[in-house]
Amino acid sequence: MRFFYYLVFIVAGSVFVGCHPSANSRGEVTGVRQRAFRATVPYGMVYIPGGSFLMGPVDQDITFAQVEDNKQVTIAPFFMDETELSNSKYHQFVNWVRDSIAITKYLNDPKYYVHPKGAAAPKNGKKYIDWAFVAKNPPWVNKKGATNNTNKLQSMFYQGDDRVFDRDEIDVRLLKYKYDEMSLRDASDYQGDLTKKRSDFIRHDTVSVYPDTLVWLHNFTYAANEPMTHGYFSHPSYQNYPVVGVTWRQAKAFTIWRTRFYEHYRQSRHLPSDREQYDLPTEAQFEYAARGGRIGANYPWGGPYIKNAKGCLLANFKPGRGNYSDDGATYTVAVRSYFPNDYGLYNMAGNVAEWTASAYDAAASSFVNDLAPTFNYNAKASDPEIMKRKVVRGGSWKDVGWFLQNSSRTYEYQDTAKAYIGFRCVTAFEGRDIRDKH
């Protein structure tokens, strides 16, 4: 009987070993076979091939700052939004935050949550919103026969003396997005320190997501911009115009949400993650993409002039003293206006200036690396104001032509919003070239 059990053990062990993925490797290291991968371009983005370029000014330094040096640098391939982020897309973020808060803090209705069972049930006890159900049954719309949510959601509207004409308007101060982010740079600074835990490098932040619509007034004193304050973010005529009035922290929060939004979709379809996280472009990525592969070009369209042969202005900016409209618009224009550059990117110069991921230092070019250069600093609320400066690129509808140059750089503080600053996202390409077969 003992021999029988021993024989069964050997047979079972043989079956176990025979089923191992390396059973046919004949003792050689053959690697772990993974699924075939074919890179796809994310929706609304274009592929920017990697390459080397001379970063910095190609024209005279009219500011006489004498701190802008040229530097030959190399950029890895990446994907970039072909346009500035529109009001419509940012509205999707705001609405997601609004609905999340309504469901989790005010309704507490089980039908808005998924109810997985068995192994699929979350082990941390957290509840997850069933967004497919929410899309068909919005908490703000009372369909025939549906439970009336008006009373439960009343606290999300302005109350008492804050109401105007007794209208139900969302109190936008409640719309805050809370997120966690692993800081790889912080972790790398403590390399080999065994006293640190992973949680020491996870940063937590809570950001108000609604744009500051009053920027149209406090950015331009003694100007009648009330119509832009009332309608720019809310009126459907502006849905395809670039979002403005967002701080750097709000733009960063959007990139985190966009990453999570895509990952949750993949998880809901039981698909593996196939994309790097979204982020703001570094200033080197922005300049490289703006040049469109052209060498020594002043502007994204390649030529040294801001007008074409017919005398038409090639971007939305301020062409003369007190003159904002000769380019075809008084304020901003739709995100697909004017011709794209050779990479297919719209408005890399003009329309709205854009936040980058890079912190600002006047002499950054003298100390950043020549491979994927950037200067990053995660400023805290307690840090001096000078540490909260972020690089702004591209020039805007209210700027003169010099700011439209590919190499022109300026800055704003990360917690300030402007009527002329927006943003677009990037995500890294994993591999050497999109044409490679994996």
Residue positions per predicted region:
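Short capping motifs at secondary-structure boundaries
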Residues: F78, L85, V94-I103, T255-S268
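Short, structured beta-strand segments at or near domain termini in extracellular proteins/domains
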Residues: A419-R435
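Functional-site microenvironments in short loops/helix caps that host divalent-cation chemistry
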Residues: H20-R26, Y47-I48, L54, D59, ...
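Non-catalytic, alpha-helical, charged scaffold/linker segments
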Residues: K105-K197
